[in-house]
A protein has these predicted regions:
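Ligand-binding face of N-terminal immunoglobulin V-set domains in extracellular IgSF glycoproteins
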Residues: 94-138
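Amphipathic alpha-helical protein-protein interaction segments
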Residues: 35-37, 55, 86, 100, ...
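Flexible inter-domain hinge/linker segments at boundaries of tandem extracellular adhesion modules
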Residues: 13-28, 67-72, 90, 103, ...
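Short, conserved beta-strand segments of beta-strand-rich sandwich/propeller modules, principally
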Residues: 43, 63, 119-123
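Structured beta-strand/turn binding interfaces of compact recognition modules in eukaryotic regulators
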Residues: 39, 45-49, 67-69, 100, ...
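N-terminal V-set
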Residues: 49-94
Length: 146
């Protein structure tokens, strides 16, 4: 290899290392806890923000994954996964969950016809290439007042 090609390769990989430092994806929830009642509908909030100036931003499809955390936090149960036009719903959530889709950066999950088993903590994970971030949202039962 010529010396000029080696120099170009060196600078290219140096640029990759510099460009990849620091997070370029941030996931947030407007509320850490939401309330609803049995049989009702609820939106679990989740929004993500990308750094459009980051190297490689926008070349990978965004993958959104929602899981429910078990009460001991040792296991995650798959609820919903979306990547582009591809979507998959798991278990008892089939036909009852979908992404709100208010904007391109909205990963909020809508759950309809809530059951007692739906209450608990949910994790929203957004993945773009090698970058990922998560947020946890609690779904609690709304009390009934007489």
């Amino acid at each position: 290899m010529s010396e000029s090609i080696l120099i170009v390769i060196f600078f290219f990989f140096s640029f990759l290392i510099i460009a990849e430092n620091g997070p370029h994806l941030l996931v947030e929830a407007e509320q850490a806890k939401v309330f609803s009642h049995r049989g009702g509908n609820v939106t679990l909030p989740c929004k993500f923000y990308r750094d459009p100036t980051a190297f490689g931003s926008g070349i990978h499809k965004i993958r959104i994954k929602w899981t429910k955390l078990t009460s001991d936090y040792l296991k995650e149960v798959d609820v919903f996964v979306s990547m582009g036009y591809h979507k998959k719903t798991y278990g008892g959530y089939q036909g009852r969950v979908f992404l709100k889709g208010g904007s391109d950066s909205d990963a909020s999950l809508v759950i309809t016809d809530l059951t007692l088993e739906d209450y608990g903590r949910y994790k929203c994970e957004v993945i773009e290439g090698l970058e990922d971030d998560t947020v946890v949202v609690a779904l609690d039962l709304q009390g009934m007042y007489l």
